[in-house]
């Protein structure tokens, strides 16, 4: 006996069988696919370009409105090109190489057009809806600091929300940092290892130690996930770790009235790794810049940060806010989430402080 069959499209089928269906279970929270975890970082240039452009679109729209310019058609056209490249096989990196080349060409074109809309000028504009008073690197060919190979100065803009201002470097007399076996800054007492990892990060204001175990420790593992080479990371990836040697121990590289940079050089059998660590006079932030000549295959690089923070939750930045994730592995579901993603920051905090 043949069952009764009716030909219909997907939309009609879903509407007929799923709409107002009270027997369907509801899922509340983050959807997590227990495979293809490598796509969080595969083709990272694309992910970085996509996120940068998302922010530039906001700036272009805002400045167009404030100037009374009608750029809606142009911005809409550029948005569509960006959204095409957010297709699920493009942005994750699970594609063939020509797709990568096409996407990066699109990103370059979109950014050039957005830069025309945003424009240039002699003043800096704060696009945030609150005062920008965090220490910021401002490019300047005559600057006294170097970041990502570019000269500039570290300044506190102090620009109100949605306002513009000129920025000028201020000079401070006197030493703000003591460099010995322990590095003393206004905020921290820091003990470095030769490979750039931090043996101790003592907070002077709060009177507590933040480092617990390996902190800013570079680790490289053998990465042979099987069928999906560039897309998967196996749960046992830590089983085989690759030796890293220090070719140049950490030492002071550059210093001015706002920032002190320390440099170390590391190497494996085939690759070299330059790590620059920055400490600041007017910021609790510690910045790490990595310059890598990567010639490895089937290897996975990570930086480990063992934090002296007791919390069951981590707050992770996403494209539209943040998400709260568990930090423990009590259940099989939590154990499966050994690899998660976030954008600019991840925050581990107690009531009186934390590490982000």
Question: Model-predicted segments: where are they?
Answer:
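Short secondary-structure boundary/capping segments
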Residues: 1, 20-23, 139-140, 304-310
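Active-site and substrate-binding clefts of carbohydrate-active enzymes
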Residues: 1-119, 125-127, 156-160, 168-171, ...
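Catalytic and substrate-binding regions of extracellular carbohydrate-active enzymes
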Residues: 72-76, 84-304, 327-332
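Solvent-exposed beta-hairpin/edge-strand motifs
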Residues: 139-149, 309-320
């Amino acid at each position: 006996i043949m069952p009764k069959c009716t030909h219909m499209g997907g939309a009609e089928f879903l509407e007929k069988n799923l709409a107002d269906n009270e027997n369907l279970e509801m899922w509340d929270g983050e959807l997590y696919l227990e495979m293809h975890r490598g796509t969080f970082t595969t083709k990272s240039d694309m992910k970085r370009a996509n996120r940068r452009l998302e922010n530039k679109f906001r700036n272009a729209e805002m400045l167009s409105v404030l100037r009374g310019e009608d750029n809606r058609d142009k911005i809409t056209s550029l948005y569509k090109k960006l959204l095409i490249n957010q297709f699920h096989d493009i942005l994750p990196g699970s594609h063939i190489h020509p797709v990568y080349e096409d996407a990066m060409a699109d990103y370059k074109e979109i950014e050039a057009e957005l830069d025309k809309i945003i424009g240039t000028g002699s003043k800096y504009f704060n696009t945030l809806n609150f005062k920008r008073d965090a220490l910021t690197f401002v490019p300047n060919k005559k600057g006294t600091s170097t970041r990502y190979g570019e000269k500039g100065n570290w300044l506190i803009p102090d620009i109100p929300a949605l306002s513009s201002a000129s920025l000028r470097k201020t000079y401070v007399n006197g030493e703000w940092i003591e460099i010995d076996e322990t590095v003393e800054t206004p905020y921290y007492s820091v003990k470095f290892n030769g490979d750039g990892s931090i043996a101790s990060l003592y907070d002077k204001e709060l009177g507590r130690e933040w480092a617990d175990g390996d902190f800013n420790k570079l680790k490289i593992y053998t990465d042979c996930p099987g069928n999906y080479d560039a897309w998967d990371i196996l749960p046992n990836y830590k089983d085989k770790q690759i030796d890293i040697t220090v070719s140049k121990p950490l030492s002071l590289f550059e210093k001015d009235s706002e920032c002190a940079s320390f440099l170390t050089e590391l190497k494996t059998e085939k690759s070299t790794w330059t790590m620059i660590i920055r400490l600041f006079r007017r910021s609790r932030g510690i910045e790490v810049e990595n310059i890598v000549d990567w010639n490895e295959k089937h290897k996975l690089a990570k930086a480990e940060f063992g934090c002296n923070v007791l919390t069951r939750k981590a707050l992770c930045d996403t494209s539209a806010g943040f998400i709260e994730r568990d930090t423990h592995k009590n259940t099989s579901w939590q154990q499966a989430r050994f690899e998660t993603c976030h954008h600019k920051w991840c925050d581990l905090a107690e009531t009186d402080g934390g590490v982000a």
